[in-house]
From Swiss-Prot:
Subunit structure: Interacts with DA1.
Effect of residue 447 to A/S: Abolishes deubiquitination enzyme activity
Primary subcellular site in the record, as a coarse category: cytoplasm
Tissue-specific expression: Highly expressed in rosette leaves and inflorescence. Expressed at low levels in cotyledons, stems, cauline leaves and siliques.
Protein source organism: Arabidopsis thaliana (Mouse-ear cress)
Composition bias type Basic and acidic residues, residue spans: 247-256, 764-773
Listed InterPro entries: Papain-like_cys_pep_sf, Peptidase_C19, Peptidase_C19_UCH, USP_CS, USP_dom, Znf_MYND
Keywords linked to the UniProt accession: Cytoplasm, Hydrolase, Metal-binding, Nucleus, Protease, Thiol protease, Ubl conjugation pathway, Zinc, Zinc-finger
The protein's name in its UniProt record: Ubiquitin carboxyl-terminal hydrolase 15
Binding site residues for Zn(2+) 1: 130, 133, 150, 154
Domain USP: 438-744
The family this protein is said to belong to: Belongs to the peptidase C19 family.
Amino acid sequence: MLEPRGADIPILFLVLVVLPVVAYILLGKWSNISEKRVRANLLAQMAAEEALRAETVVNADRGVRFESVATENRAQRTRTKTVSAGGGAVRAEFDAGARETVAEQRSDSVTATCGVTVVAPVNNNELHVCARCFGPAKTRCSRCKSVRYCSGKCQIIHWRVAHKDECVPVESCSSSSERVSFEKDSVLYDHGMDSTMYSNNTTQAAKGKTSKSSVDFASLGISQNDITPQINTQGRKSVGKQHSSKANRESCRRDSATVFDSSDEAASAGGDNKTSHIKHKSRGNSYAAETNPRRHSVDSSAVQMNGQSFVSGMQESHKHENNLGVRSSFGCPNTQYPSNGTRTATLPRTGINKSGEQSCTETSKKGQVAAVSKTVRSKDTGISEESNGISSTMGIMKMMGLRNSTKHDDRYKNLKMLFPYEEFLKFFQCEVFDLSPRGLVNCGNSCYANAVLQSLTCTKPLVAYLLRRSHSRSCSGKDWCLMCELEQHVMMLRESGGPLSASRILSHMRSINCQIGDGSQEDAHEFLRLLVASMQSICLERLGGETKVDPRLQETTLVQHMFGGRLRSKVKCLRCDHESERYENIMDLTLEIYGWVESLQDALTQFTRPEDLDGENMYRCSRCAGYVRARKELSIHEAPNILTIVLKRFQEGRYGKINKCISFPEMLDMIPFMTRTGDVPPLYMLYAVIVHLDTLNASFSGHYISYVKDLRGNWYRIDDSEIHPVPMTQVMSEGAYMLFYMRSYPRPQRGEHNGKAPVHHSQPRNEMKEQRKPVNRFKPRADHKNTESSSSEWSLFTSSDEASFTTESTRDSFSTIDYTDVCHVVDSSSPFAIFNNVYHNVEPSPHNTVACRMFSGTKPETRYFVEQETNHNNTVVLDATPSLYPIPAPYPPHDYYDQSMYVNYETNPEFNNGQDQDRTYSYW
């Protein structure tokens, strides 16, 4: 065999290893050099463009060709020869007026240049003229670099006369390099805009034609062709290398914030021996411009000399949400809609009122900013606009070609809503009658899921939203979606047939929680929390998830509108009487039922009664600078639209169950358990009950069933696939585990005072588990760091029901002895008998006497109602005193309930018309 020689190995190494490495290094360096060269060329090009822009700003509106000056001089000489004996004075006045006109036009040009880029390259070989004597200019203003002078004397005189009020530094002006022409498709008002607002001069300027002054010099015997050419400061248009001094000013649309609606009009009053002068009046009296992330309110009557900011009539309007109007020097209100990082514009509208006087109407709007709806109230100061006088902000922004801002003021964050509350009100108040409950197949210990799904499908606002199928139309998820699955499930309820199956929901829920859907018996409450949390995450998925959305915005989703409420925790130091409050969102209430609790009202009373913090749970007061005894009290600040109450029947750690009978009302009054400073809720109507049927009082085994009231008001007992209609008495006699209540009318939209929570001033010494007042909430606020931060009720869907699990165990179960041997079942002969409290039993009256009794921790309260029965499905409607508030209104006034009324359960003189007898109600 032929073997390679030893001399070939170095050559092969050189060819196969060294040369590729060297080539790779050289190619890398060559690539870097090429990139640097391209970058250098790009920087040089950008520098050249910047220089061109600076030169454009300097010379665009000030460069006048020398031949135009010569034409003016010839016109002046002609007028001197033509005018009669009194012409000398007329000529002097005309010259002064012409100079004043040029000064005003240049002032308007300087103002227009700020915020609007005008790109019209000017030939450097042109001769510039002096701003005062119109002679050949040799120097220019060192500050604005836009006005030329022939000598220092002219510069000083012109500065004192006019230029000191109009000089604006170059740095404050915009440097954009694009031009915008007012074509037919550029910037237009909405269809309500009056076409007569634009004059012929403006129309000609939009078409790029030269406009002439409308000055009438007939009395002087001078033709308009002999007059000094008017320098239109609206912009310049260059055609090839020729530049006309009569070109119209153009506005720039690239990220520009100013829309000009102005056309210079000239009018003169002349006579034989009377002075004549030129007046220029702008149609657009004022405008708003913004060239920096900071907001600038621009007033046409006042511009600061430093050019950094503009003066307006109401420069501090951003401090007040309702004061959004900016008045100009002409008394015309201009509406400004500030937004950080966004250049906004004010479009003033003019009109003629009945008296013939010209007035300006404030532009009002109601729309969305950055795809988030917010409402702005406006006041009309002139004529009313067409239709309802409301225009969309997005329409204005699209009309002007502006982009949405990514940064906004903090004060507008409180007004943003991920899901409009008005849409939720429509879902809450709509009527759905074509749905009927259908059974669900037990997929293997799935009774807990079936009971929860049956309760959710009877939740009216959720069902109305799912029937609309608005989520599936816009859902971008490629994988399985819970909301889409629920929509399909609700749509199948409209069809008649056999039992449905929730196997798809259970199988996908297992990917979220490994313990759900694997065939083992689980807790219905845990499954409900999982469903609600999943729906909430889906609502936030489009915006990047829970971690990227502001906590305040997370409270404005559809799920929060339905199940979200607000809880207040108040801690009072018993030494210095210092109080600190904190507000937290809640999604449901978990109530203890041990001890003396025999009714739902008792459980709520125990939940809201004050608790002393002492011993190991002492409170650290910042004012006392130590651990002191304190008193803590929980109360509901805002009642949710859908109130979910969980009765804590399962024992913690022993797998036992409190199997006592807890009475609950069909109509629940939450006023005694509210803070009375926030929401004033109406009655809550019961629509679903989940019951846990056990054996041997054990929590690790059993069966879940549900009682639901369909949207027609009929009650059904649903046991997986079996459905049976039942009377109300059977529902009220069951040992409920979960209760679902819905408000009789929706909660008013949250105000700004509810958006901020006070900062707590104290920290706990030791972690403590408060099993007495557990509360489930969805999302902790990031700025809440206070005393109860380690308490169980402040965790995500708190582990307040730590015993509410049903995992199998080999431990011996025990039967919890009921605290009462008597099951207090409310007599349902009267629909109001459910309000009877165990402390004060009232015998049912044959005349259906209404005695609404609620007990709080300190004093009892009552609520009087007028019982009415409509013809629709025998629905009982509760109303307050007719003089206070009618039921059809969406929101009641704050004085809907007289909370200072002393308790009088048997009689009410107001209803009895002065008679000393019990008020009785009969059906009609």
